[in-house]
Amino acid sequence: MVPIRRTDLTSLSEGRALQPVSMPPAAVPLTVRTVLALLVLTALAVLVHGYHLGADDAAIYVPAIKNVADPSLYPFGSEFFMSHAHLSYFANIVGDSARLTRLPIDFVIFAWHAVSIFLLLLASWRLAALCFLRRSAQWGGVVLLAALLSVPVAGTALAIMDPYLTARSLSTPATMFAIACYLSNRRAQALAWLLFTALVHPHMSVFAAAFLVCLELARRPARRQENLLAFGMAAGLPFLFPLHAAQGAARDALYSRTFFFVYQWAWYEWVGVFAPLAILWWFSSRDPRGTTRVFRTLAGAAIPFGLFFTAAAMVVGMPVWLENYTRLQPMRSLHLVYVIFFVLLGGLIQEYVLKKGIARWLGLFLPLSAGMWFLQQASFPSSMHVEWPGSHPDNTWNSAFLWIRGHTPKDAVFALDPNYMLSPGEDMHGFRAVAERSVLADSVKDSGAVSLFPQLAEDWRSQTQAENGWQNFQLADFEKLATEFPITWVLTRRPGPGGLTCPYENRDLAVCRLPSSAELDR
């Protein structure tokens, strides 16, 4: 290990302004005090950013987790979430932990969400310790990241950390650990974290590996072998997907994900692409006070990383015959750029602005946290801010879902409005995730599965089209639907249609049982 220069040690001992050093300081030990501080930050992050079981993207991930914990669930339609789950071990890790501990599955999912936030903050603290000399600056980076977990990442439809559990919840801290280990010259540990990332989220692991390559190229000139390897990987890309436009229902599903196509992004979303990269370039070209060389290396590596994938997104988003490649979502690379950016920015804000003033810390982080709290309130206006496991929901949709979970058979198959997730008051909660019952495909989240797995397209279209005109369905329409699909129950607007037995109603919804074939024959 190359020692820190004597002049830097002299500056430290005399209390003079810290200057950048050529090597990072020795690894900061993880003390009980640090762990407690990270636990407090984790708790505050949950309270600020909220938690929502099975909402949005978790509507795909949570059913797979629950299916691992209880294989008797979801006898119909599981392909719409298992297509994702079969590609990783994320559902197995979480689902098996519930099965082995025998704890309530909703509590286990919430616990993993909290653990994932703790791990992200711990990994960010490890990385900040390599970039900043002062402990206060290191914590500045971690606290800023914790305060901004809900920040949207440009036009990618991602946040730094979602207020619900997904595979990204674990892949993000794993990626940060991999980067920190790599920059600490612990290559074996970096590889182990990279492999773990691939196991829980293969897609995001590609970006993690690419960033490590950018770090290596930033630290030393590219070797010919590396160039040949990169060329070989790029040469294989044309064989991933067919080189022609998507067809039929698969194309409809693909174009339902407008964020795949960067030319449809708004101007402010493009600002979200280039502003962080420009600031990171400025970071890499300066010698900020109290930073190490790792700071500049990290900032410098993020620039070609972000620009490369932005260029890739622009290429695949232009010609129609390349539109299948938009499924690779190269702009998701910005997710990692944002995490690194806020860690570095937070450290510099502390170093230059906040310093040791408690009032300054509160003056910055209280308004930021309040802004994130209001953002989440606006995103989930009809739900509790933190949907604690076992609590009684305010949301009438979730109330109906939970009644269904507790009062209908596990093999029940439901039908409901294919656009139910967009209904006022629903707040994007997934039926399968909360009710734990099978259901016909929807037009909101299941279309996302189809956009990535076009082999599901025809089943998806047949199920969603069969429910066209749902708002006007009467008994005869439900009976006709039951002849096409094995549905036994429906969730519809109150009051339930005449002729159906509806054992549950709330102020908005009714849960109704369809008559069996024997009852219809009478």
Q: Where in the sequence are the language-model features?
A:
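Extracytoplasmic
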Residues: 379-522
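Transmembrane alpha-helices and membrane-interface helical segments
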Residues: 122, 126, 177-184, 211-219, ...
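Membrane-interface transmembrane helices that cradle and orient dolichyl/undecaprenyl
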Residues: 23, 170-189
